[in-house]
Regions:
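Interfacial/gating helices of multi-pass transporter permease domains
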Residues: 1-21, 73-74, 171-175, 179, ...
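Small-residue-rich midsections of specific transmembrane alpha-helices
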Residues: 6-35, 84-90, 183-192, 210-220
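Alpha-helical transmembrane segments of multi-pass membrane proteins
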Residues: 14, 19-23, 59-62, 69-93, ...
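C-terminal transmembrane helix end/exit motif
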Residues: 29-32, 92-99, 103, 123-126, ...
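Interhelical loop/hinge segments that connect adjacent transmembrane helices in multipass membrane
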Residues: 104-109, 131-133, 147-191, 199
Length: 220
């Protein structure tokens, strides 16, 4: 429906987003779900998450500008990055559900968000054959589901706010940093070959490489 070049753009966009979004995730949930003594209220995790999401988006802009991509490719990559950033925001709420031993709520929210986002993406691609418009629709659906299924439910359980105690937020940042660095480097290693193909061979080759690479990655 899209052709080799645009499909390759989407493929490398997903790889870049999966790599850079480790900054947004920052292993915050790992610490959040084990904070059984509630050392940090939800607002601290939420504030740190939003800060890391902003850094992720800025990093994605720097990356695409540094690589000199075409305007269309820049737009595709940034839209995919935004989708993954929205995922990381939802992860904050789902981490709170998990900490309260309601992993079922996390699972339902994640299922609905991913299912309907992909469904909208596929349907709009088939109908419009416009990748950028389809990605915008996917992001809108993901945002609406986060607001309706994550934020609205979490609002009845915790206080959703941005805290001003940046000193404690920085302490939380330092706690999460070692695991975050490990995850960032691991994801870079996984995606480094695809990033090299993108730099050396172009979008069409990226599509074919992904078709070969994906089964091997899943098996490993």
């Amino acid at each position: 429906f899209l052709g080799e070049a645009k499909a390759g753009m989407f493929s490398i966009g997903l790889s870049i987003a999966q790599w850079l979004v480790t900054i947004a995730y920052f292993e915050i949930r790992t610490y959040q779900v084990t904070d059984v003594k509630n050392e940090y209220p939800f607002g601290y995790y939420f504030t740190l998450r939003l800060m890391m999401c902003l850094i992720t988006f800025l990093a994605s802009i720097v990356y695409v500008v540094f690589n000199g991509y075409s305007p269309e490719k820049v737009t595709v990559i940034l839209l995919v990055c935004i989708y993954k950033i929205l995922d990381s925001v939802a992860d904050t709420f789902e981490g709170e559900f998990q900490k309260e031993e309601r992993i079922d709520m996390s699972g339902k929210s994640e299922f609905y968000r991913i299912f309907f986002s992909i469904l909208v993406l596929v349907v709009t691609v088939i109908i419009t054959r416009n990748l950028i418009f389809s990605l915008i629709c996917m992001n809108v659906v993901a945002l609406l589901i986060i607001l309706c299924l994550d934020a609205s439910v979490a609002a009845g359980r915790v206080k959703i706010c941005i805290v001003r105690d940046y000193r404690r937020v920085f302490v939380l940042f330092k706690v999460c940093l070692p695991l975050a660095i490990s995850t960032f480097l691991s994801n870079y290693i996984i995606n480094s070959s695809k990033l090299s193909v993108d730099r050396m061979l172009g979008d069409a080759a990226q599509l074919y490489y992904t078709a070969v690479f994906m089964p091997n990655m899943v098996i490993n």
